[in-house]
Regions:
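N-terminal export leaders
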Residues: 1-10
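A short beta-strand-turn-helix
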Residues: 30-48
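C-terminal cap of thioredoxin/glutaredoxin-like
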Residues: 5, 136-231
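Sec/Tat signal peptide C-region and signal peptidase I cleavage site
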Residues: 18-23
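Structural alpha/beta surface segment adjacent to cysteine/selenocysteine redox centers
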Residues: 51, 56, 62-138
């Protein structure tokens, strides 16, 4: 079976149909799927955030990505991204490491753009060589020199593995896993649990409800969506 088609089938199997739900922050997941939820909170000073565990080779993540960006920009809330490269995918780990290179060594905004472009061109990247060629073209287009060795000391790979470890502690089992989180410790799962829906469009009403629910909190500063490093 074609690897790309097989990956799409797996992603489809992991995405459960959307079940109608009220737009509200429910608190701890009722199905008990998620374990250590202590990290499900916005960055300091923010009332609400979108938390995403993603795999750059995941077709469902590629479909959700522009919706995440649109929702975050519309409501002026940050996106906190965790890399969760699935072992069945050929090049997703290397792509995550290079995104970290851009974030840490070049420009976080360029790292965001790299992730967006990888998702947009995902269907044409079938191997590590394809990813290397895509990345070289991306760097040239943005006036950057391609490093001879991206991660000589393994620090960036360690950051990606640390993100993956956070996902394991939370009990992430599929990608994308998406939450809307509040600064009062409440959250709602948009995608990724065992029993709920998987429609990223739910981000809009849930973020709206979360902002109303936290309206008495200190106002959040309006800012652009930024990539966040987790160690």
């Amino acid at each position: 079976m074609n690897r790309r088609f097989a990956a799409a089938l797996v992603a489809g199997a992991l995405s459960l149909p959307f079940a109608a739900a009220h737009a509200q922050i429910l608190g701890p997941a009722s199905d008990g799927h998620f374990k250590d939820t202590s990290m499900l909170k916005p960055p300091a000073g923010q009332r609400v955030a979108v938390v995403v565990f993603e795999d750059l080779e995941c077709p469902a993540c590629a479909a959700a990505h522009p919706i995440e960006l649109q929702a975050a920009q519309q409501y002026h809330v940050p996106i906190v991204r965790y890399d969760f490269p699935l072992q069945m995918h050929v090049w997703s780990f290397e792509a995550a490491v290079f995104a970290r290179y851009l974030q840490d060594k070049v420009n976080p905004a360029l790292a965001d753009e790299y992730r967006t472009q990888v998702f947009r061109n995902q269907i044409s990247i079938a191997s590590k060589d394809d990813l290397q060629n895509f990345t070289k073209q991306f760097m040239q287009k943005h006036g950057q020199a391609m490093p001879f060795v991206v991660d000589p000391g393994g620090k960036l790979a360690g950051e990606v593995k640390a993100d993956y470890g956070v996902g394991l502690r939370l009990n992430v089992t599929r990608t994308p896993t998406i939450f809307v989180v509040e600064n009062n410790g409440h959250y709602e799962t948009i995608s990724g649990n065992e029993t709920g829906g998987a429609d990223p469009n739910r981000l809009f009403p849930v973020i709206d409800a979360a902002l109303k629910q936290t309206h008495n909190s200190a106002p959040a500063a309006v800012h652009t969506v930024a990539r966040t490093t987790h160690k």
